[in-house]
Structures are given as C-alpha cells and as structure tokens.
Amino acid sequence: TTQELLVEMEDTDDLRRRFDDLVERHGGQVIESNLSRRDGCIRIELTARLEPPITHDEAMAFMKENPGVRRMSV
C-alpha cells in the first residue's frame, strides 16, 4: 500500500529515530520525501510503501507516547 505521511515534531535525534522505527515496523520503503526545518521543528512529508499502512489509532498512540510530536497525518 502506498501511503502519504506527514509529521511535524521537535527536531531531535530521538524523535527522528522513533519516527523512522515506526515506518520500518511497517516495512517502509520511501518513494519520495520532503524535509524542512523551522523554529526548532522538523517537518517530514513522505510517500512510502507500507504493509500494513499506519492507522489513525497508531498515529494517535505515537503522538501520545511522544509529546514532541506536534502534528501527524496518515
């Protein structure tokens, strides 16, 4: 399944690793990415092949577990 993901979060090594881990748990193969930084935050927009796709509930749990995540779209 091809899925578009967007995450805005504090720009820390730990949060980037946690997001990468989430994508990898779904067998993520990045097709396209767009990255930008602003005011201590990073915005990551990905188009990726994921199996299974990341669900709304998983996105909510990821945000709850990682307070530095400000926005996430799946």
Task: Label each region the model flagged.
Residues Q3-L5, I42-A48:
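Short, hydrophobic beta-strand segments
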Residues T12, R49-T55:
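Helix N-cap motif at beta-to-alpha junctions
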Residues Q29-L35, M60, K64-V74:
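Conserved short beta-strand edge segments in small beta-sheet-based binding/regulatory domains
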